[in-house]
A protein has these predicted regions:
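A charged, amphipathic alpha-helical module
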Residues: 1-104
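Anaerobic metallocofactor- and corrinoid-dependent redox/one-carbon enzyme cores
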Residues: 19, 24-27, 71-80, 84-228
Length: 228
């Protein structure tokens, strides 16, 4: 079961889910909608004792300092509680514009923490991205990471996305180690700024729907240092 929090991000028409194709192709896989208002309500209703306990924890990885840690903890605990309550196997969340605009907090630090715990989470309401990540998890591919494809040449491509990479895929010290920062765009908290480790064997893959049918692309590669 995949939970969609909100809808796909504005303008991302290709990410509009097809629940019927999903259910038919992937043997009964269910898409469940959860409103962003339900998420925010759950975040605001977080028990103070649980909130205080979570804020004392270090985030997995190399960083310990937190940015606006109360709201980040609220989102993390609310997402975790809703995932457990609805028995979700993966999540796609509309991470903008409502959460940073209306709640004052990007969900990326919470997403990173959930990803480090093994939950496939796709941003921008990307249900097929969450589906791809879930399949990778079931196949034992390791921690999945969803990213934009920025540019490429004949043998490599550059991937980048704003702030929710699992820390297990990053270096834990030195340049590129994860650091919590405000978002580069609107300066609201909190994103995880990090660089993928070099020398990892990787599987690049994607499911998508076209004309009511699912398609897939998959290839193998190896991570290397970015040029810039």
């Amino acid at each position: 079961k995949i939970g969609l929090f909100g809808q796909q991000a504005p303008g991302f028409v290709d990410l509009h889910p097809d629940p019927f194709a999903l259910h038919k192709t992937f043997q009964g896989c269910i898409l469940e909608h959860v409103g962003l208002s339900d998420l925010i309500q759950a975040a605001e209703a977080t028990d103070q004792a649980n909130l205080d306990a979570d804020r004392k924890l270090n985030v997995p990885g190399a960083f310990a300092e937190r940015v606006d840690d109360e709201r980040s903890s609220r989102l993390y605990l609310a997402l975790k509680r809703l995932v457990e309550a609805e028995n979700l196997d993966a999540v796609a969340i509309r991470c903008w514009p409502e959460l940073p605009r209306d709640y004052g907090q990007w969900p990326y630090l919470a997403i990173t923490r959930l990803a480090d715990e093994g939950l496939p989470v796709a941003c921008e309401g990307d249900v097929d991205g969450a589906l791809t990540m879930l399949c990778c998890k079931f196949l034992g591919c390791g921690a999945p990471y969803i990213s934009d494809w920025l540019e490429h040449d004949h043998s490599s491509f550059v991937c980048w996305h704003g702030g929710m990479c699992p820390t297990c895929l990053t270096s834990h010290e030195g340049p590129g180690a994860p650091v919590i920062k405000p978002h580069f765009n609107n300066k609201k908290p909190a994103v995880v700024d990090a660089t993928l480790k070099s020398g990892m064997d990787v599987t690049v893959c994607r499911f998508w729907v076209c004309d009511g049918a699912y398609h897939a692309v998959i290839c193998n590669g190896r991570s290397k240092p970015p040029k810039r």
